[in-house]
């Protein structure tokens, strides 16, 4: 399966009631884009560095916030292997795997829990596959 198929079929899927993520991507730890949805924001190198720093030392982004394509999200949870950000009625979930970062961005009516489930389910699958 291509990386784009993972984004299209597993991240941008309907989670019920017609709700889908606003955008999604799978990127390498170096920030290279493996696959993304059409409207996923272009990440800046310093944003990827901040994300990787938070995965390596939890809480790194808490004082400054999580930035994705210049948009700031308040970090509400940083747990082992995942970063969750909130912005207004939307937010983002990031899941680190051995080689990649799975990113989902949502807006209402999708809920934070639905976004977390979609992103973490694919992230956990990739971890199980050694990716």
From Swiss-Prot:
Keywords: Actin-binding, Allergen, Cytoplasm, Cytoskeleton. InterPro entries: PFN, PFN_euk, PFN_sf, Profilin_CS. Gene3D superfamilies: Dynein light chain 2a, cytoplasmic (3.30.450.30). It comes from the Eukaryota. GO terms for molecular function: actin monomer binding. Its main location: cytoplasm. GO terms for cellular component: cell cortex; cytoskeleton. It holds the Pfam family Profilin. It is found in: Cytoplasm, Cytoskeleton. Occurs in many kinds of cells as a complex with monomeric actin in a 1:1 ratio. Binds to actin and affects the structure of the cytoskeleton. At high concentrations, profilin prevents the polymerization of actin, whereas it enhances it at low concentrations. By binding to PIP2, it inhibits the formation of IP3 and DG. Belongs to the profilin family. This is Profilin-2. It comes from Parietaria judaica. The lineage of its organism: Eukaryota, Viridiplantae, Streptophyta, Embryophyta, Tracheophyta.
